[in-house]
Structures are given as C-alpha cells and as structure tokens.
Amino acid sequence: MRPALEMYMTPVIGVVCFAIIIASWFGGVRYFKGIPAGLVAIAVGMLIAWGSAFMGFSYGGMSLEKLTSSFSSFGFSIPIPAFGHVFSGFEFLAIILVTAIPFGIYNLVEAIDNVESASAAGDSFPTTRVLTADGAISLVGCLMGNPFILAVYIGHPGWKAIGGRIGYSAATGIMVILLSWLGIIAVMMSLIPIVAIAPILLYIGMLIGAQAFQETPKSHAPAVILTLVPHVAAWGKLQIDNALAVAGTSAATVGFDKLGQVGILYQGLETLGGGAILTSLVLGSLAVFLIEREFSKAAAFAPVGAVMTFFGFMHGEHIGFAQSPSVALSYLIVAFVLYGCKYASYAPKPAEIHEHHIGPLSRWTNRD
C-alpha cells in the first residue's frame, strides 16, 4: 500500500514513472535501444525531481543542500564482530521473544512461499537448502552486529518477467556491499527520489497478487481473499495507532465506544489483526479444505488455531496464557462443527475448470 500512497503524494513523478513501467512490463513497449523500463522510470523521475527543484517547485524533495551534505558519509568501513552485544541481549529475551517467534515463523513461511512462487514461474529450487542458507547467513550477520535477518526476497515472477536472472542477484549483492562499505547509500538517497522507485514495488505487488489467483485452482479464490482479511485489519489498526500516537493519545484514552460511533471497530481490528500471518494460514487452510470437502482436515486446523490463539500467537498483541480465551473457545467449537459436517449430507464438489492455466506464468510452467 505504501508505494501506491507515495506515488499519489507526488503524482507528477510517481504516476508518470508508473505509466512508463507498466507500459513496458504489461504493454510490451520497448524503450530506447532496449534500456530497461525500470532504469528509464528512475531517470525520468530524477529529471522531473531535479528539474522542478531548480525551478522552485521541489517535487520529490530533492535539494543541492541535502546532496552536498550526504557526501560527508563517504568513507571505507567494514562490519566489526559484535559477539558481546549478541550475548548481552539475553537479559531482554522475554521481551524479544514476543516479536522474534512470530517474526521467525513469518520468515519461514515467507521463504517457503517465495520458493513456491519461483516454482510456479518455472524455476525450482531445493527448499531445504534455501532455508538452511537463509538461517546460516542470518546468524553470521547477527554476529557482525546486523539486526536484520536474511530473507528470500519476494517477487520472483516479477523479477523474472523484467529479465532478472542469477546475475541480478549477484549484482545486487555486490552493489549492496559496495554501497554499504563505501557509505554511498546516503548519496543515492539524496540523488534519486524515492517516489520514482515506488512504482517498481507496486508492480511487483500486483504480479504477486495476480499469481495467487492464477496459479491456484479457481475454486480456491475465496480462500485467497479470506487470507487477506487479517492483514487488512492489522494494517488498519497500525494506521489508527500511529495517527493517535502522533496526536499524543491512544485508542484506549479516546475510548473504544467513541471510536465505534464513527465506524472504527478498534477491538475488532485488534483481535482479527493480531498475529495476522498465522491467522491467515489457519483461516486459509480451513477455507481450502472446506472447498475441497475434506472436513476432517478442516476440523484439524481449528484446534491448532485455538491453541495458538490461547497463547497469543494469533488474535493477540502479546504472548502469554489466555490472551484471547473467547476466540480460542470459538475455534474449538468450530472444530466440532466441522467434524460433524463429515457425517452430514452436502453438495458434491463443483467440477474444477482450470482456467488459471491461461496466465503468462502458467504458460511458462506448461511449455514443452
């Protein structure tokens, strides 16, 4: 969502660059002797931003003062081992685990999802090796003082569609090392308007969203939509919290009843959006198994949701005991209901029409 919002905050750059990108990547337009559309968009964005700055409009927030001051970060610096900081952090372990466990699960699921996404685009990678490399390199980074874990980057079909291959990953790694060690990132940030890059991220998101529908059975579309709902709730709550925090208050201070009077069901957003990643997995699995008339498997996922909800991994802001007991109880009741459906009469599963194979990603995977 943020890339789209950034585009329309500075539409003279964002919308124009977005048009340049989708004209090439969706419309097949070729630019100036094969120059990549992303590079053309960034160049046009820089031209508009700096041109407007010299004319006094300052679209994109570029200025010579910022660019000049950014050169002060130039210099050669390499990561220094930080073993002491790593182990001294154990005194904060209880606080860290509240975030680390859900985030670790998210990173695992995201890596598996992205490997599957690559497979759907025609490139198969060994999942175990990918996850092992992901974890091992993250550990090395932590010992060097890096608080950010390595992640299998999202959007393989999109990068492949614009011509990215193994050299793209290698070049990215080399560039990140050079930019970081030489202190060039600040200069790049002061030279290139962020809004010129945002359309690329929006395009990747569009392609990933489309793939979720194109590469799954048509009958599973409702399940895909259902998995998005907890994330929308989490996003909505975050926007409300940040807005109230800037105003120096909070939802509890304002009052849930007052928020409800203007249509903001804050407690509902809080419950539904808590642990959105795991919630989406459970709800999506329930929906898929129900669509497939596999009631026993659907019923098996409900107790899983109950346990994770009880301990705060789902539908809660904190890990602990009895975080959302009423929601946990509802999942247990759902388990009995779904298991009972196994013995009820029900309509046969609709015949699947594999229309999703007409998409471009499917054509890649089905070519002889």
What are these regions (language model features)?
Residues I42-A43, F103-N107, L131-L139, G173-I177, ...:
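Transmembrane helix-bundle signature of multi-pass membrane transporters/permeases
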Residues S324-V337:
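Small-residue-rich transmembrane alpha-helices that serve as helix-helix interface/gating elements
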Residues F57-G84, A243-T271, F336, G340-D368:
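Intrinsically disordered, low-complexity non-transmembrane regions of multi-pass membrane transporters
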Residues M1-M55, L179-P325:
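Membrane-embedded alpha-helical modules
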Residues A49-G56, T68-N114, L269-L281, L329-L332:
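Hydrophobic, membrane-embedded alpha-helices of multi-pass small-molecule transporters
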Residues F32-I42, S77-V86, D113-V115, A120, ...:
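Hydrophobic alpha-helical transmembrane segments
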Residues I137, G141-I197, Y203-I204:
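Long, well-ordered mid-to-C-terminal structural blocks that present hydrophobic/aromatic surfaces
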Residues L93-I166, H357-T365:
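Membrane-embedded helical hairpins/re-entrant loop segments and their flanking transmembrane helices
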